[in-house]
Amino acid sequence: CDTPASRVVAERWPTEIIFSGFEIGNMIFTGKKLVQMDVKDSPVKDAYSLCFAEGDPNGRMSWDLTAVLVAVKGYEPYYNVERGTFRVVNDEGANSWTPDGKGKDLRLIEKVPAVEMAVLIENYMMHQPVSK
């Protein structure tokens, strides 16, 4: 973790940042159906297969995937948001969120239940390109 860089980004980024916190991806488990697919040469499937071999029988928590989903599709209709300010508060990288209607950042708030989000995200992960 590069805490100084994180602090600089949080303080100086010129536009709002949408934060997908620990609590968002922590309960969204994905990958279980993906690794059972009958496809070859899938880097996503291969990576998840390795993770499952290391002890994630119910799927992987999906922090990064929720951030990607929102970056590509937007937070509606999946999440509500709360405006506020994100801060890196110490040299170990601990951070805080302060709700503030005039803050420059947004934080995702659960709207669609985690189980439904897992199905949605995993369906995107399982998508195969159409041959032309």
Segments (PLM) and residue ranges:
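Conformational coupling and interaction surfaces
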Residues: 1-4, 8-11, 15-132
